[in-house]
Amino acid sequence: HDIGFWKTQAQFYNNWEGSYTHTFLASIPHIIPGCKAPFLCNFISLSFLIYSVYIFVRTFIKIDKKNSLIVSLYLTVLLFIATSGGAEVRFWVCANFTYLPELALVLLFLSRYHLLYNGRNKPIDWLVIFALTIGIAGSKLTFIAFSFICILIHDLICRRKIDKMMIIAYGMLTILTMVNVLAPGNLVRLTDEHMHNADVISNFTLLDNTIYRLKMQFSVIFYAFLL
């Protein structure tokens, strides 16, 4: 707060991490006079996630608004169950702003892309796609940013073509993701927290956590199919 909003972004980028979306969102409450209510921030973040899940459900599942809302709330609860640090995501502002809005951006991106893929081609759709691309590339969910390349490959193989505007979007996504991944702060943080690749114990811990998360994610998919 003392060094200013934009200098704070640069400070985090150079000394902590490259996830500029999280840094940007987490800094907003500190520049709003009188905003000292973590509950309000968490509520806004959670509401945005529920809204994005609702839009996703409405886009891919043809059911009425009431049932769409019920399914959206149910899926949101399952997402929390599948999160190993669920309490942190719900109650800690930093973790809340780190993951919930970024996941919401991904769901909105997929929903909008589905509309474009099925023939809708309005300028507002592309503006939304570009805006979401900027947010996703700067998030901690970099694996999702890279996985979108699969969509591009699918279009090239199955449709034998790809929209020029989508090529621009993927170009933005790739460049901005590299800006995130190659941030000086990432290396600084790894050094400070002693996360060395040669540490066998750390690697096994990472593997165990990864397997746990995969099991939880598959359980979410299983329950979703039961709907």
Residue ranges and their predicted role:
Residues 1-40, 93, 142-148, 162-227:
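Transmembrane catalytic cores of multi-pass membrane glycosyltransferases
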Residues 19, 69-114, 140:
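Membrane-interface micro-motifs in multi-pass membrane enzymes
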Residues 21, 40-51, 96-109, 148, ...:
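Membrane-embedded alpha-helical segments of multi-pass membrane proteins
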Residues 43-66, 70, 108:
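Transmembrane-helix motifs of polytopic, lipid-linked glycan transferases
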Residues 49-55, 155-156, 219-227:
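Hydrophobic, aromatic-rich transmembrane alpha-helices
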Residues 75-83, 133-138, 172-183:
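Aromatic-anchored segments of alpha-helical transmembrane domains
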Residues 115-134, 164-168:
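Short hydrophobic alpha-helices at membrane interfaces in multi-pass membrane enzymes
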Residues 125-141, 146-152, 175:
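Membrane-interface alpha helices of multi-pass inner-membrane proteins
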